[in-house]
A protein has these predicted regions:
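Outer membrane beta-barrel
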Residues: 71-104, 112-191, 214-218, 222, ...
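Solvent-exposed loop/turn segments connecting transmembrane beta-strands
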Residues: 149-156, 182-184, 204-206, 228-239, ...
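Transmembrane beta-strand segments that form the barrel wall of outer-membrane beta-barrel proteins
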Residues: 45-47, 135-149, 174-176, 212, ...
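Residues on the lipid-exposed face of transmembrane beta-strands in outer-membrane beta-barrel proteins
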Residues: 41, 67-73, 124-128, 162-166, ...
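Residues that define the transmembrane beta-barrel architecture of outer-membrane proteins
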Residues: 35, 61-67, 118-122, 156-160, ...
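Beta-barrel outer-membrane channel/assembly domains of diderm bacteria
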Residues: 15-17, 21-142, 390-397, 405-440
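Repeated loop/turn-to-beta-strand initiation elements of outer-membrane beta-barrel proteins
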Residues: 39, 78-81, 132-136, 171-175, ...
Length: 440
């Protein structure tokens, strides 16, 4: 019998941090467990109205108030320091009557169209720091290109698992970990990690997601990331990005960049065959407080570009407020204009307007695909859709209301030639008010 050694993303991450540890200098002075502790409470008021224009059903209209309390301790003194983080979250329904649930900011109702009045969760994380390496175990807030918690609703998404990060070298960050469960942003309990667009067979789950990655920012204006992940028995997913900002002078800058994902089925292939290469290219011209960005995005493969359920791990330029423009073999273009009103004497006020157009052939999707058959459309030979997004945000700069943020978002999405098999014709409005409170 031949034994084989598999270099999983978690193994590679641990190996990558062992070498820096061996050469690390003396640990820098740190504050103690109590002295380095702090508590913050973020209040988030969230209203969403999703007006479905192509079907005769009630709109999804919900309004809620969220509270996120986060306590982070310092570390005990010594070469190896120990600490503890604790979080508690509460979501309250302010409005969401019969037939208007389903906006996704509140838990879904039990068939009566009414969301529950409240939902809550709490969790903790044990942490250990030695030199420039930090190990965490418990409930994690993750944010990287292959596993990122959704932050676009009233409460954040979290994961239960283990993570490891290292900052031994200037400009470099190494990380890795394993997550087995997730707390979705509109739920109280934990569940196994699924995917946003795939349908797993009944009574089956992926047991965990492993990841490893490295980030580089050691050259002024240049950033790059390389990540690998495995969603057990579903896929291997790899990611690379590169972006460089070149300042022509004090007023004008040029920023080209790219994002690339490769996704391949693995193990039991619970979602069926996957062989997907997706990339996006962008070029931004900044002139003072103005910027204009043009992007091109392409999905190569007869399955959509997919990522974890409710997550934000879709680091593609054309992922928008409503649609990700990630259909099988989809090509899309975007033009975006942004303005910072500090140029008119109103610091803290920013705006952006985007228009995106995409098209694909949904008849190429396998109607018998184990996980993605719902993407097949016999009328989708020349499927098209477009989206227009308007985003306005103001952050109070001083006084007692300092850091209070008000954000208005409006998305319009329209499809034709069979694309409604996936995305609906929708007008979506969001009003979000954040107020962070630093208790100590």
């Amino acid at each position: 019998m031949k034994n084989s050694l598999t270099f999983t993303p978690l193994f590679l991450a641990i190996a990558a941090t062992i070498i820096p540890l061996a050469h690390a200098a003396d640990a820098p002075p740190v504050e103690g467990f109590v002295e380095g502790s702090h508590l913050t409470i973020n209040t988030r008021n969230y209203y969403m109205n999703r007006d479905r224009r192509d079907i005769h059903t009630d709109d999804s209209k919900e309004w809620g108030q969220g509270f996120i309390g986060t306590f982070e301790s310092g570390y005990t003194q010594g070469t190896v320091g120990f600490g503890l983080d604790v979080n508690a979250m509460l979501g309250l329904k302010l409005d969401g009557g019969g037939g208007t649930d389903g906006s996704s900011i509140l838990p879904y109702g039990s068939g009566n169209g009414k969301a529950p009045g409240s939902f809550s969760t709490a969790g903790g994380t044990l942490k250990l720091r030695a030199f420039d390496t930090e190990l965490k175990a418990g409930d994690l807030f993750l944010n990287n290109p292959v596993i990122a918690g959704g932050m676009t609703r009233m409460l954040p998404q979290t994961f239960r698992g283990v993570s490891l990060t290292n900052h031994s070298f200037d400009g470099w960050m190494f990380e890795g970990g394993q997550a087995s469960f997730t707390k979705l942003y509109n739920q109280s309990g934990h569940r196994r990690i699924g995917t946003s667009y795939g349908t797993l067979p009944a009574n089956t789950d992926s047991q965990h997601l492993d990841w490893a990655g490295v980030s580089f920012s050691g050259i002024e204006g240049l950033t790059s990331n390389l990540y690998a992940s495995e969603l057990k028995d579903v896929w291997h997913q790899y990611y690379y990005d590169l972006e460089y900002t070149y300042a022509l002078n004090d007023l004008v800058s040029l920023t080209p960049g790219l994002h690339y994902y490769h996704t391949q089925d693995t193990g039991q292939s619970l979602l069926g065959d996957i062989d997907n290469n997706t990339y996006s290219l962008h070029f931004t011209v900044g002139v003072g407080n103005h910027s204009v960005t043009a992007t091109y995005q392409r999905v190569n493969g007869n399955t959509p570009f997919d990522y974890i359920t409710q997550g934000d791990s879709v680091y593609l330029d054309n992922s928008q407020q409503y649609s990700d423009f990630n259909g099988p073999n989809e090509r899309s273009w975007k033009l975006k204009y942004a303005y910072d009103f500090a140029g008119l004497g109103v610091p803290g006020l920013t705006s952006a307007v985007s228009y995106i157009s995409g098209k694909t052939d949904l008849t190429k999707v396998d109607p018998n695909s184990r996980g993605y058959s719902n993407w097949y459309s016999a009328e989708g030979k020349d499927a098209k859709h477009w989206e227009r997004d308007i985003d306005l945000k103001y952050v109070v700069q001083g006084g007692k209301a300092k850091d209070l943020a008000i954000r208005l978002q409006w998305a319009t999405n329209r499809g034709s030639n069979g694309y409604s098999a996936v995305d609906r014709d929708v007008d979506e409005y969001r009003v979000i008010v954040d107020y962070p409170i630093n208790v100590f």
